[in-house]
């Protein structure tokens, strides 16, 4: 439907990601909260994903591993803060390869006429941390994820 917008506010330790999906917020939320669906779209398209733990509730923890075609593994973990809903999914995010460099992601979903705007604000501990994440190839992973999520959403049926 639309391209992904990635904004790096100058001098601020944030990344703002926005993308519209031709799907109701309920489906976009479901794709974010069900581990089996999450594994089908999150991350660069050439990587496979294994969800080890995904407790989408206040205080719940999560951990997943991306594996590249070369077998190299990249593990990530975090904690949910508050009850995840379309009004907000708040969670920490840490790449285990760089422990201690934790960011806070706040994702909101706004639906209008069957189109959902997904907006994620990632707050880093410093501009240097943000810039290191961007330099690691984050943009390609974010764009691949958006395209893969759009394709997945087209296959899902809303639950009434």
Protein language model annotation of sequence segments:
Residues 1-48:
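Hydrophobic ligand-binding cavity/cleft-lining segments
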Residues 12-18, 49, 61, 75, ...:
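Intrinsic-disorder/low-complexity, polar/charged segments enriched in Ser/Thr/Lys/Arg/Asp/Glu/Gln
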Residues 16-17, 36-73, 160:
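Short beta-edge strand/loop motif at the mouth of beta-sheet-based domains
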Residues 19, 51-54, 76-82, 93, ...:
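Hydrophobic/aromatic beta-strand elements that line small-molecule binding cavities or substrate pockets
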Residues 25-26, 56-57, 81-87, 108-117:
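A short, structured loop/turn motif at beta-sheet edges
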Residues 28, 38, 62, 80, ...:
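Hydrophobic pocket/interface hotspot
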Residues 69, 94-100, 121-128:
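Short, solvent-exposed aromatic-acidic interface loops
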Residues 125-160:
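A conserved amphipathic terminal alpha-helix motif
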